[in-house]
């Protein structure tokens, strides 16, 4: 051997702490928020993360001499203090691209977060952000269609799209489920939706639901003259079953299907995305289980990382929270990962939680979906925050209308069109929200009743996971 092999244990920072390293354009960069055990130096903690998420092990091994370890290792090249947090720090790590299989989000996450989170030297660890190099992005399939293709397919332009989740989300028979879909779509919504946990239960088998939903869509299209859709959830316990459900939706002439991408897994999601592009189907993505992973401010994976990974894995729509509704998410953070879903280039901006410049090249964008505890009074804020390339989904805010789901849908449609008209006329939606909505309600009894019904409903809880610059 040309090099001497010295058996034993040495500190991680001797190999993986490289403050003089300048990251390459082809490197995959990651920012971790680290909280080490008491007495362990920051450099050792950060280097341990770099080692355990790349080539390292706890002991020197002879087989290191069989490869160029210095080429393949992850390198911690910078450490920063976390604003307002004396215990934690940011570790910036560069990984050579050859560590990862081309186009495999599964492989990237297995490396970066697969084992290191159980490391004893750490009290907490959170993956805050990833900068994917263009060479990796070009190897990924991405959204099966993208924003423009979806608008063309649905023939809907110049405004956010409207949707709602069918309620109650569990317990309805297939026929009654289809009836609720029909009421919502004829009332003015663009989409209705299966909830994340409706698959194929004893009270409603999936074939039965798909058939009645297809009938509801066709009837509502005939009545309204508009293209309609329903997110048919094809998530299943096996890939074979998932594709069987997707094929049946295609046979029924449905424009869009749905997948729970975290519980279903990135491998299944990427495969389904490829199938959708090949078969001309839109793909709606639900983020069920995300808060288990992303809500703790010191441990887990930030949702901006999951959003980036989803854009690479594939999906045309992704739930992002609402800012104003019942679910977690402050305004600036939400805007940050909405940018990651839709824009072709997102600059580093710590005020929005983006730690790196991210160039998406020509990869299509993803519709941001606002869903969870929203109603007509929220419409001006939602249009302001999310813009046109979004889907605004009102579940209880549709079905809870005193006159029923069709009236709730009509109220939402009138409120949306009033806000878009006011915005296009140069009015300030959030400052003039009450005037805009009450003016529209003079010509819509459905909206007037909705405004009265939900005038006192607010979700004013403090956000648990705040941007560190706010702390």
Swiss-Prot record:
Q: Mind telling me which residues the site (Transition state stabilizer) is annotated on?
A: 326
Q: Which Gene Ontology MF annotations are present?
A: magnesium ion binding; monooxygenase activity; ribulose-bisphosphate carboxylase activity
User: According to its UniProt entry, what is the function of this protein?
Assistant: RuBisCO catalyzes two reactions: the carboxylation of D-ribulose 1,5-bisphosphate, the primary event in carbon dioxide fixation, as well as the oxidative fragmentation of the pentose substrate in the photorespiration process. Both reactions occur simultaneously and in competition at the same active site.
EC number(s) given by UniProt: 4.1.1.39
Transmembrane domains' residue ranges: none
Q: Which Gene3D superfamilies match?
A: Ribulose bisphosphate carboxylase, large subunit, C-terminal domain, RuBisCO large subunit, N-terminal domain
Where is it localised?
Carboxysome
UniProt cofactor(s): Mg(2+)
GO cellular component terms listed in the entry, alphabetical order: carboxysome
**Corresponding gene?**
cbbL
The answer on whether this UniProt entry bears the keyword Metal-binding reads yes
Its recorded reaction(s) are: 2 (2R)-3-phosphoglycerate + 2 H(+) = D-ribulose 1,5-bisphosphate + CO2 + H2O; D-ribulose 1,5-bisphosphate + O2 = 2-phosphoglycolate + (2R)-3-phosphoglycerate + 2 H(+)
**GO BP:** photorespiration; reductive pentose-phosphate cycle
The protein depicted here goes by the name Ribulose bisphosphate carboxylase large chain
Details of cofactor binding: Binds 1 Mg(2+) ion per subunit.
Q: Which organism is it from?
A: Synechococcus sp. (strain CC9605)
């Amino acid at each position: 051997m040309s090099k001497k092999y010295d058996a034993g244990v040495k500190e991680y920072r001797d190999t993986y702490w490289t403050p003089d390293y300048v990251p390459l354009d082809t490197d995959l960069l990651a920012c971790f928020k680290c909280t080490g055990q008491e007495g362990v130096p920051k450099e050792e903690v950060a280097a341990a993360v770099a080692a355990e998420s790349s080539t390292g092990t706890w002991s020197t091994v002879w087989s290191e001499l069989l490869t160029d370890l210095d080429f393949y290792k992850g390198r911690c090249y910078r450490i920063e203090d976390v604003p307002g947090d004396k215990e934690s720090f940011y570790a910036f790590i560069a990984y050579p691209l050859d560590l990862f299989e081309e186009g495999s989000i599964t492989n990237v996450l297995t490396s970066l977060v697969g084992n290191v989170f159980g490391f004893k030297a750490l009290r907490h660890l959170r993956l805050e952000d990833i900068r994917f190099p263009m060479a990796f992005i070009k190897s990924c399939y991405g959204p099966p269609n993208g924003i423009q293709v979806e608008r063309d397919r649905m023939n809907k332009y110049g405004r956010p799209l409207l949707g709602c989740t069918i309620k109650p989300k569990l317990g309805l028979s297939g026929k009654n489920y289809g009836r609720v879909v029909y009421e919502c779509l004829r009332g003015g919504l663009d989409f209705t939706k299966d909830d994340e946990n409706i698959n194929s239960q004893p009270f409603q088998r999936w074939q039965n639901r798909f058939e009645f939903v297809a009938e509801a869509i066709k009837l509502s299209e005939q009545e309204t003259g508009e293209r309609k859709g329903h997110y048919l959830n094809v998530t299943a316990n096996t890939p074979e079953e998932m594709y069987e459900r997707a094929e049946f939706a295609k046979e029924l002439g449905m424009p869009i299907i749905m997948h729970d991408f975290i519980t279903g897994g990135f491998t299944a999601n990427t495969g389904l995305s490829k199938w959708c592009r090949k078969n001309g189907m839109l793909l709606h993505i639900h983020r069920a289980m995300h808060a288990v992973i992303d809500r703790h401010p010191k441990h887990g994976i930030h949702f901006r990382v999951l959003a980036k990974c989803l854009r690479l894995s594939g999906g045309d729509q992704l739930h992002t929270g609402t800012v104003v509704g019942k679910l977690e998410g402050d305004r600036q953070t939400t805007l940050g990962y909405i940018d990651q879903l839709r824009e072709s280039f997102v600059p580093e901006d710590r005020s929005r939680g983006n730690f790196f410049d991210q160039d998406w090249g020509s990869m299509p964008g993803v519709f941001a979906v606002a869903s969870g505890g929203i109603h007509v009074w929220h419409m001006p804020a939602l249009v302001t925050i999310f813009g046109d390339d979004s889907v605004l989904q009102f579940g209880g805010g549709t079905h809870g209308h005193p006159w029923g789901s069709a009236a709730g849908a009509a109220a939402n449609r009138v409120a949306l069109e009033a806000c878009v008209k006011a915005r296009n006329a140069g009015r300030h939606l959030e400052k003039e929200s009450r005037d805009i909505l009450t003016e529209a309600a003079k010509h819509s009894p459905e909206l007037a009743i909705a405004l009265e019904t939900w005038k006192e409903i607010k979700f004013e809880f403090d956000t648990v996971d705040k941007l560190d610059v706010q702390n």
